[in-house]
Regions:
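Short, Lys/Arg-rich, polar N-terminal cytosolic tail immediately upstream
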Residues: 1-15
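A structural signal for multi-pass alpha-helical bundles of membrane permease subunits
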Residues: 15-305
Length: 305
């Protein structure tokens, strides 16, 4: 009896193990096929000269050396991307926080506005929205029409002007503030109302409450949003490709767009792979810097004095 019970238990355990492997199998296959193997392959290709038509030729560090010594457009793309990140990320986070604080109020219309404000985050990366944005900022677009109606004469093409083209991409990025806004809103609702009541009793006004209570207690959420938005900012691609295609005069040639051109425009897969690894390194360094600095500005509830 004991042996049969033990055998049945072992058989059941074995069946559960097999079912576990069966359920994890599709994820594992996808992970290996679309993440792990391409990850390793791109690292290997970064040391080769490969154009997809012939076998890869090992060139050592030649791709990396060329990037920093001979390719002027590489440095241009890097500069444009840094400028984009420095402009777009703080503005998007500030705008998202302001809207989140407005939507924190109890109102029957708040759920409706949450959906409306979140829609750009879903639609903003689509081709249709990018084409619409291109029309809005064109010479005969909606923006110039509105400015002319207000008596401000404007007939410039915002996306073709080297001084304003990057700002058109920045504004589109800011417009997609729904995701960080919802995260901020969730964090704001976790702050106890008793803190604000105590501050009011002490005579603290709204600005003082914001800087002494809201901002410190929201700093972990700000930290999370900053990291996620920074990573997304460094990888911005589709909007730049569809709206400006890197122009005018490479003023909107972001890093990911230049990487795409090298890899799939000029078929320099080895060079493109090397660029991808440099981008990964840049994102890793900046993420590490944010993590290292977090001890100085990220506070938790038990640290607030």
């Amino acid at each position: 009896m004991k042996r049969s019970a033990g055998s049945a238990l072992a058989a059941r355990q074995q069946l559960q193990n097999r079912m576990g492997y069966l359920f994890i199998g599709p994820w594992l296959i996808c992970f290996l096929s679309f993440t792990a193997i391409p990850f390793v392959a791109s690292f290997a290709l970064s040391f080769t000269d490969y154009n997809m038509l012939s076998a890869p030729v090992f060139v050592g560090l030649a791709n990396y050396i060329r990037m920093f010594t001979k390719d002027r457009l590489f440095m241009t793309a890097l500069t444009v991307t840094f400028k984009f990140v420095l402009l777009a990320i703080p503005l998007r986070l500030c705008f998202a926080l302001v809207v989140a604080m407005i939507l924190k109020r109890d109102s029957k219309a708040v759920p409706f506005y949450r959906v409306i404000y979140y829609l750009p985050s879903i639609l903003g990366g689509s081709v249709a929205v990018s084409v619409m944005w291109r029309y809005v900022f064109s010479k005969t677009g909606v923006l110039n029409t509105a400015l002319n109606a207000l008596g401000i004469m404007s007939n410039i093409s915002w996306i073709s002007n080297k001084d304003t083209a990057l700002w058109s991409l920045v504004l589109l990025f800011i417009w997609q503030f729904g995701s960080p806004m919802l995260i901020f809103l969730s964090g704001l609702k976790q702050i106890p109302a008793s803190y604000y009541e105590a501050a009011e009793c002490d005579g603290a006004g709204k600005p003082r409450q914001f800087f002494a209570i809201t901002l410190p207690l929201l700093s972990p959420i700000i930290f999370f949003n900053l990291v996620m938005q920074m990573i997304g900012g460094f990888m911005v691609f589709s909007q730049a490709m569809i709206i400006t295609d890197g122009g005018p005069m490479n003023k909107t040639l972001v890093y990911a767009l230049y990487l795409y051109r090298q890899s799939f425009g000029y078929y320099k897969m080895g060079y493109g792979s090397a660029m991808a690894w440099i981008l990964l390194l840049i994102i890793g360094v900046f993420t590490l810097l944010v993590f290292k600095s977090s001890s100085a500005w990220v506070f938790y509830e038990n640290q607030i004095k």
